[in-house]
């Protein structure tokens, strides 16, 4: 697929086909700036070369197959990504902002207790083209102001393709977005150091408990990617510039919502310039956890602020269409596809 290729790769494509070197830049402009969906649109490339391109290459653009709309304006898109596989993307409009939450894997290996995506298992990484197609193909593509890699999957378990997609989004030959418009979420997976070194996008870390043993029960990935090691890596990086790091903390009733947890959270984050986002737990099937109530979340927030941290309670969006944090799953769509085939 041409979508997801770098300028260098597109130039190589052009040269292999006997086209002039500058045709690589033409291809990049048509793919990333003009967002062409068909080679026939590329009118400054000869008809003969357009035909050859179409015979050899897939442009990588395809439409969504379903969309659901929430009462709060949130929209959830379903995208096919190969035979019988799907991913979901979520559009979150808010005032003059439009944030798209995109997926990086089909399912997820991390198997977090509170997340529906992990319950469906892992069925492959997305290519850079499949990641970018989500951005290009939603109805609101031209209105997007921010991107968050917080959909299905662990982005830094698919570091190569995630970084390729970010390159196409932020380089001048691509979409030319500021990295400040993009946030990548992780539990602290193996690609963290490379992400910090090779991109300038914001980082969000899924934390959820300051106590490693408790976190391991909620997030089995703690065994392979200990939070304390993740925090050491983050401390070693200079976040004094415009790049930000935030920590996501789902607040569970009677589990991690007391002042002991708040104080320990403050202790382990000491010295890291960061924001803490408190998130309500959204009920999913076969999981007995419950969300903490507003009063306890507010008390937790104030305690974190007393320790000198910026702490906010994040608004829930799209819960009625299973588009809120931890609720994305394409198991039903994939099951329906299998039955119809």
From Swiss-Prot:
Please report the stretch or stretches of sequence annotated as the Radical SAM core domain. 94-314
**Predominant cellular place of this UniProt entry's protein:** cytoplasm
Q: State the reactions this protein catalyses.
A: adenosine(2503) in 23S rRNA + 2 reduced [2Fe-2S]-[ferredoxin] + 2 S-adenosyl-L-methionine = 2-methyladenosine(2503) in 23S rRNA + 5'-deoxyadenosine + L-methionine + 2 oxidized [2Fe-2S]-[ferredoxin] + S-adenosyl-L-homocysteine; adenosine(37) in tRNA + 2 reduced [2Fe-2S]-[ferredoxin] + 2 S-adenosyl-L-methionine = 2-methyladenosine(37) in tRNA + 5'-deoxyadenosine + L-methionine + 2 oxidized [2Fe-2S]-[ferredoxin] + S-adenosyl-L-homocysteine
Task: Look up the EC number in the record and give it.
Answer: 2.1.1.192
Give binding positions for S-adenosyl-L-methionine: 153-154, 185, 206-208, 282
One matching Pfam family, short form?
RlmN_N
GO molecular-function terms, A-Z: 4 iron, 4 sulfur cluster binding; metal ion binding; rRNA (adenine(2503)-C2-)-methyltransferase activity; rRNA binding; tRNA (adenine(37)-C2)-methyltransferase activity; tRNA binding
Q: Which InterPro entries match?
A: Aldolase_TIM, Methyltransferase_A, RlmN_N, RNA_MTrfase_RlmN, rRNA_lsu_MTrfase_RlmN/Cfr, rSAM
Note the SS bond partners.
101-325
Q: Where do the annotations place [4Fe-4S] cluster binding?
A: 108, 112, 115
Q: Which UniProt keywords apply?
A: 4Fe-4S, Cytoplasm, Disulfide bond, Iron, Iron-sulfur, Metal-binding, Methyltransferase, rRNA processing, S-adenosyl-L-methionine, Transferase, tRNA processing
One biological process term in Gene Ontology: tRNA methylation
Name the residues annotated as catalytic in the UniProt entry. Answer: 88, 325
Q: GO cellular component annotations, sorted alphabetically?
A: cytoplasm
| Localisation per UniProt entry | Cytoplasm
Q: What does the entry's cofactor note say about binding and number?
A: Binds 1 [4Fe-4S] cluster. The cluster is coordinated with 3 cysteines and an exchangeable S-adenosyl-L-methionine.
Q: What class of enzyme is it?
A: transferase
| CDD domains linked | Radical_SAM
Other facts noted in the record for this chain = Reaction proceeds by a ping-pong mechanism involving intermediate methylation of a conserved cysteine residue.
Q: Which family does it belong to?
A: Belongs to the radical SAM superfamily. RlmN family.
Q: What does this protein do?
A: Specifically methylates position 2 of adenine 2503 in 23S rRNA and position 2 of adenine 37 in tRNAs.
Under what name is this protein listed? Probable dual-specificity RNA methyltransferase RlmN
Q: Which organism is it from?
A: Porphyromonas gingivalis (strain ATCC BAA-308 / W83)
At the highest ranks, the source species' classification is: Bacteria, Pseudomonadati, Bacteroidota, Bacteroidia, Bacteroidales
């Amino acid at each position: 697929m041409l979508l997801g290729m770098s300028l260098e790769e597109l130039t190589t494509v052009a040269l292999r086909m006997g086209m002039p070197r500058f045709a690589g830049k033409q291809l990049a402009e048509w793919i990333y700036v003009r967002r062409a969906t068909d080679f026939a649109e590329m009118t400054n490339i000869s008809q003969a070369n357009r035909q050859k391109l179409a015979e050899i290459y897939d442009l990588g653009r395809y439409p969504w197959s379903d969309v659901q709309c929430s009462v709060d304006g949130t929209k959830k898109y379903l995208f096919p990504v190969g035979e019988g596989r799907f991913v979901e993307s979520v559009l979150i409009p808010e005032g003059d902002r439009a944030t798209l939450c995109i997926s990086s894997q089909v399912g997820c290996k991390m198997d977090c207790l509170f997340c529906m995506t992990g319950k469906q298992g892992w069925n492959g990484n997305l290519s850079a083209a499949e990641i970018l197609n989500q951005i290009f193909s939603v109805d609101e593509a031209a209105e997007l102001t921010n991107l968050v890699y917080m959909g299905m999957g662990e982005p830094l378990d698919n570091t190569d393709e995630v970084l390729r997609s970010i390159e196409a989004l932020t380089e001048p030959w691509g979409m030319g977005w500021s990295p400040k418009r993009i946030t990548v979420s992780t539990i602290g997976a193996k690609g963290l150091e490379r992400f910090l070194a090779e991109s300038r996008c914001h980082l969000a870390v899924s934390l959820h408990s300051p106590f490693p043993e408790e976190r391991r029960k909620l997030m089995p990935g703690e065994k392979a990617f200990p939070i304390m090691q993740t925090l050491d890596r983050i401390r070693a990086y200079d976040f004094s510039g415009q790049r930000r790091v935030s920590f996501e903390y789902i607040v569970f009733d009677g589990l991690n919502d007391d002042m002991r947890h708040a104080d320990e959270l403050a202790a382990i984050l000491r010295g890291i310039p960061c924001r803490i986002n408190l998130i309500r737990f959204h009920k999913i099937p076969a999981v007995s956890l419950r969300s903490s109530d507003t009063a306890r979340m507010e008390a937790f927030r104030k305690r974190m602020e007393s320790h000198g941290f910026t702490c906010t309670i994040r608004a829930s969006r799209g819960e009625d269409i299973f588009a809120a944090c931890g609720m994305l799953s394409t198991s039903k769509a994939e099951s329906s596809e299998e039955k119809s085939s």
